[in-house]
Amino acid sequence: MEEVLSEGVDALAACVDDMAKCLTVSKVTTDRSTKLAINMLQTKRVFQLVSEYDVQRARLDLMEDIEPLLQKLYSKLEKALTKLERERATLSQTFELNKLRFNNQESNPIIDNVKSDPVVIVSSTHEELERLKDLKNRKEELIQRIQELHEER
């Protein structure tokens, strides 16, 4: 009988060891899925606990905080853009005027007594620059006509 009890105790000990091994293996494999399930449940709980009113209120508070900042940034951006646009127009005008001056010097190397007008840079539109080009060309034509009349005499 002692022998049977001893075998029973040994079998029970082996069974407990096997059960402990199974528990450690199942704990390791389910640990990841448990963390995932807990995270999903927490996310679900957050949405269940927060009422729609609280969400709308938080959204409005956020808009009240961020809207003025966005308006400031938008106005700064508009000012910078306006400044860059003026600078571009000025550079374009300077380029056009220098191009006209260069063309004037190339076409009239003989004329020393006629000086070109001083370049005054002001804010102008594309149409004004076109008008200026036309006037410069007209001036050049008139100077050539004057030269021709002087040569005829």
Curated annotation (Swiss-Prot):
InterPro entries: DASH_Spc19
Record keyword Cell cycle present: yes
Subcellular location: Nucleus; Cytoplasm, Cytoskeleton, Spindle; Chromosome, Centromere, Kinetochore
Superkingdom of origin organism: Eukaryota
Coiled-coil boundaries: 68-153
GO BP, sorted A to Z: attachment of spindle microtubules to kinetochore; cell division; mitotic sister chromatid biorientation; protein transport along microtubule to mitotic spindle pole body
Keyword match Plastid: no
Record key words, sorted: Cell cycle, Cell division, Centromere, Chromosome, Chromosome partition, Coiled coil, Cytoplasm, Cytoskeleton, Kinetochore, Microtubule, Mitosis, Nucleus
Cellular component annotations (GO), alphabetically ordered: cytoplasm; DASH complex; spindle microtubule
Function as written in the Swiss-Prot or TrEMBL entry: Component of the DASH complex that connects microtubules with kinetochores and couples microtubule depolymerisation to chromosome movement; it is involved in retrieving kinetochores to the spindle poles before their re-orientation on the spindle in early mitosis and allows microtubule depolymerization to pull chromosomes apart and resist detachment during anaphase.
Subunit organization: Component of the DASH complex consisting of ASK1, DAD1, DAD2, DAD3, DAD4, DAM1, DUO1, HSK3, SPC19 and SPC34, with a stoichiometry of one copy of each subunit per complex. Multiple DASH complexes oligomerize to form a ring that encircles spindle microtubules and organizes the rod-like NDC80 complexes of the outer kinetochore. DASH complex oligomerization strengthens microtubule attachments. On cytoplasmic microtubules, DASH complexes appear to form patches instead of rings.
Family, as annotated: Belongs to the DASH complex SPC19 family.
UniProt protein name: DASH complex subunit SPC19
Protein's organism: Kluyveromyces lactis (strain ATCC 8585 / CBS 2359 / DSM 70799 / NBRC 1267 / NRRL Y-1140 / WM37)
Taxonomic classification: Eukaryota, Fungi, Dikarya, Ascomycota, Saccharomycotina
